[in-house]
From Swiss-Prot:
A Gene Ontology term for the protein's cellular component: nucleus
GO biological process: tRNA N1-guanine methylation
EC supergroup of this enzyme: transferase
E.C. numbers: 2.1.1.221
Sorted UniProt keywords: Coiled coil, Methyltransferase, S-adenosyl-L-methionine, Transferase
Highest taxon, organism lineage: Eukaryota
Known function: S-adenosyl-L-methionine-dependent guanine N(1)-methyltransferase that catalyzes the formation of N(1)-methylguanine at position 9 (m1G9) in tRNAs. Probably not able to catalyze formation of N(1)-methyladenine at position 9 (m1A9) in tRNAs.
Protein name listed in UniProt: tRNA methyltransferase 10 homolog B
Amino acid sequence: MEEQLRVGGCSPDGGFTIVNEAPVADLLEFLHIDVELEHARDDREESARSKNVMRKQRNWERRLEVKKSKRKEEKLRKKLNRQDKDVSDAQLSKRVIKAITKERLEGARAAGLRLCVDLSMTEHLTHKEISRLAAQIRRLYGSNKKALQPFHVFLTELQEDSLLYKECVGMNDGFMHYLIDVTEESWFHLFPSEDVIYLTPDASEALESVEEDKIYILGGLVDETIHKKISYTKAKELGVRTARLPIDEYMVKKENPKNFHSKILAINQVFDILLTFRDTRDWTKALMAGIPPGKGFVLASAASKPLEET
């Protein structure tokens, strides 16, 4: 027989009159639902707080690693300068440079600003364009080796049995020993989407700065590719932020015999622009460092007869 909750009072004849009765199980179920809703609210709030704390913790750890890397680099430089006094200055200088370069690249892999080349779109490229892309990857790595503040470079969705991988190995001496991260995984599964900025010339937003806690994605397409908006479309489908280099904000079209103007850059050229901006915090210097004169653009301050943007 089901238990019941009796609520009542005394009747005129001294007896007990039941005013209301309800199954105890129903009341307990109602209370249980209320508690569950409260717990769910608490869990959501706690989850949001935890994510913020974890993000701050990761950023703090990355900054700490950068400081440690710089201190280690300085110690290594001093140590090498004290060693091998009988070695010629030229030999010692070469050894020091090589050791410091390695130390910087390892420090970047531990805590550097992350930049990824998205190599998932090679089906749109011809054999010739894939060879050009491999050459651009080589130049990109060469620039990173020379940088005062190298990036932590990722090559994503690069399969070992692909034509691009074979071109990279054949064209780039020591490619398999590059101090970068090469993976068959997609960048979308490696990084939090809210921290990603996909750089594409088709984006409406101009890149204002280079932030240490963001991940910058470059589409692995060469500047000869005729397909339009491939990387932009992919980024929008995945729901990540897109941005373009601020060419329109700092440069103008320059008259030339072919009337040729292009904002499509090789990945190593975009990389050089980001490296220079990170060192100088000056977009005019950065754009001048990476955009070849043949693209038909000059700095606004240097243009004598700029053409209007069409």
